[in-house]
Design a protein with these regions (language model features):
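Transmembrane alpha-helical segments and their cytosolic interface motifs
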Residues: 6-15, 186-222
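Membrane-interface junctions
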Residues: 69, 178, 191-194, 203, ...
């Protein structure tokens, strides 16, 4: 996972704030009054273990969301390529129908790319004959609308006797898989992790950082600044990364390369058309 300048800025700000807190405690300890309050070391260790467990679930959940998004997009791309090869093999003598279906599959993949990022714009699609792109923009779910149009064209080809029953079933399976993988993407997009859990975790980290100096201030002195810097870099960094990857389809550097995957799918389908 790469660091971006906003991430570094947030890390630096967090470290500076916690260091300012420690400097204040150190100043009070040495210049105003002696702080007799000491947190037992075992309590610090126990709280540290609890935080480690909380972060394990936090980072693990975010990574699994990222990985599930990658799998869904990969399966969609593989399904699009499989559909394109089947269409190419079944409709070699019907160039117009073949180009229509393959262009529509590219449109479907483009619409998925946009939908998972909260965009719905028919201007990003490839015009195909009488395809009502303007009407598609008004749909609540453009990918599903395009997928339905692909299914309708397959039904028409079978009714007209241009593809066999076996070919019809095979192509219909690909269309159904499109809907299944799209549903996974929509679930990831519309079901973020519970905010209460995240707020609870951040509050616990701040509480832990607040009591650490009272456990080691008499033993480490100014070296506590280095200890707290490393601690906050580690935990705050993990939280920021978790926050980024929990939305796998975003525009952050650590999010999935949705545009690159879409271009790769289009490149493969275009190669099939030209073959």
């Amino acid at each position: 996972m790469a660091h971006r300048s906003p991430v570094i800025a947030r890390l630096a700000l967090s470290i500076l704030l916690i260091l300012g807190y420690y400097v204040l405690i150190h100043y009070i300890q040495n210049n105003i009054t002696n702080l007799d309050f000491v947190v037992p070391g075992f309590m610090v260790y126990v709280f540290g273990y609890v935080i480690a467990l909380l972060f394990y679930f936090r980072l693990g959940n975010s990574y699994y969301r990222w990985y599930d998004g990658l799998k869904a997009l990969t399966y969609l791309r593989a399904n699009a390529e499989s559909f394109s090869m089947k269409v190419h093999g079944s409709l070699k003598g019907n160039t117009e129908q073949e180009k229509y279906l393959l262009a529509m599959m590219i449109n479907f993949y483009r619409s998925v790319r946009d939908k998972v990022r909260g965009i719905q714009d028919s201007g990003r699609l490839i015009p195909q004959g009488n395809l009502p792109l303007g009407e598609l923009t008004a749909l609540d779910d453009m990918p599903s609308g395009l997928n339905a149009m692909i299914e309708q064209r397959i039904n028409s080809l079978y009714t007209e006797g241009k593809i066999s029953w076996v070919e019809f079933l095979d192509l219909s399976r690909n269309v159904t898989r499109n809907s299944e993988h799209l549903a996974v993407c929509e679930a990831l997009q519309n079901t973020p992790p519970p905010k209460t859990y995240i707020i609870h975790l951040r509050g616990f980290v701040l509480f832990y950082a607040g009591i650490i100096p009272f456990g080691f201030i008499h033993e480490l002195g100014v070296w506590m600044m280095l200890f707290l810097s490393v601690f906050f870099y580690f935990y705050t960094g993990m939280e920021i990364i978790s926050e980024e990857v929990e939305d796998p389809f975003g525009f952050d550097q650590n999010d999935l390369p949705v545009n690159d995957l879409t271009k790769l799918a289009e490149k493969r389908i275009t190669q099939i058309i030209k073959s």
